[in-house]
């Protein structure tokens, strides 16, 4: 019987493609205040600043290239087509690496959405949004991003996917961002869990269940994928 594999990725995997993260010492929060660019209140107060911020991030994301970790996950899906990727990342590096079955928890930088219906999105052509552009429903388009403090629309689906995992691979996340970090709680008792992180993780609740691979994503993911494929 084919094993169900779930890959859960965070900012660290994209950082190895050159994209800035928020929480590192030299991260985005050193240059921008969360309250100014990534909350619903910020959007109401100064939408142009939010648009400019996400235009910058979109330009950077589209200039970045998928790395060996993204490509290894795509190879894993070639062998195990039912493999599901759940990502906290808003870039499209997984898709550009050839991945399918990608669930974005925090939105997608390449899309804009209606302000009346968070799930009603449109693709943006290029990297630049112009504030004031309208959705077909008449509302002003905003970045398709889950702002801090907003509900995560895909979280229930992510929990359902995690609950079906035989193998869960966690890469590029410190497991400090909730509710996404709680996904491990939904993994079945029999599931094998691998955490790929160059740093020693804080695994208070999962230490007895998690196999820690201490390596960067671009080294740890290809090595683990190769091992899983060899078992077939």
Annotate each language-model stretch with its function:
Residues 1-232:
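Conserved catalytic core of sirtuin-type NAD+-dependent deacylases
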